[in-house]
Amino acid sequence: MSKNSVIIVAAGKGKRMNSSISKQFLQIKNKPILYYTLSKFSTHESIDEIVLVTLEDKIEVCGDIIDKYNINKVSKIVPGGKERQDSVYNGLKAVSKDCEVVLIHDAARPFVTSDIIENGIRYTNQYGAAACGVIPKDTIKIKSEKGFAIDTPNREDLFIVQTPQCFNYNIILDCHEKLKKHNKKVTDDTMVLENYGKSVYLYEGNYSNIKITTPEDLILGEQILEKLT
């Protein structure tokens, strides 16, 4: 039977947090951010396995968190690579061979909802690839090289992409392997498919599905958690 697998990418160093501790290990309400993220997927009935990708020297720390909080479904903890795309590729190679849909998610997004996860799987089964996100609340400007505003896109045409980003496993693996062969750089996994002419369906995420990357995000995260509990 085919599986739905999730790759949690926890290999970032969190330089923007101005902390010696990687952002995924910082705490909200006395529990590490990574705990909340892992829990969302481990308790979701449609998720069959979790592959956690982290810094090589943090593998033991991640194992301790998993054991301490009795988080299940984590099949492997694997070391990350030099860039995020390398870490994702390591995760792709580690998922079960019978994986059909793979979700790729930032460890520092602890407030992903059950509906976002479920819809990602559903739309991927329908379209082959799907990513959640939100329409920007602010007006967006395009500026010239000299710093002047030259255009104002319609907000309805813009989309702030979040994670999970969800894919047919064979499609995303094939595109990642081509990416390595051609030595191309990308900033997220939807770009991996876009590089090879593949379409990604964009569906509604949630404004609370934030990525915690700055001290201000940590404060906002505490407020979001207060509302959820």
Swiss-Prot record:
Functional pathway? Isoprenoid biosynthesis; isopentenyl diphosphate biosynthesis via DXP pathway; isopentenyl diphosphate from 1-deoxy-D-xylulose 5-phosphate: step 2/6
Site positions per UniProt: Transition state stabilizer: R16, K23
One record GO biological process: isopentenyl diphosphate biosynthetic process, methylerythritol 4-phosphate pathway
- Residues flagged as site, Positions MEP for the nucleophilic attack: R155, K211
InterPro entries on file: IspD, IspD/TarI, IspD/TarI_cytidylyltransf_bact, ISPD_synthase_CS, Nucleotide-diphossugar_trans
> Per the record, what are the reactions this protein catalyses?
2-C-methyl-D-erythritol 4-phosphate + CTP + H(+) = 4-CDP-2-C-methyl-D-erythritol + diphosphate
Keywords attached to this Swiss-Prot or TrEMBL record, sorted alphabetically, are: Isoprene biosynthesis, Nucleotidyltransferase, Transferase
Task: Please give the superkingdom of this protein's source.
Answer: Bacteria
- Reply yes or no: does the keyword Nucleus apply: no
Give the EC number: 2.7.7.60
Family assignment? Belongs to the IspD/TarI cytidylyltransferase family. IspD subfamily.
What's this protein's function?
Answer: Catalyzes the formation of 4-diphosphocytidyl-2-C-methyl-D-erythritol from CTP and 2-C-methyl-D-erythritol 4-phosphate (MEP).
Protein name per its UniProtKB record: 2-C-methyl-D-erythritol 4-phosphate cytidylyltransferase
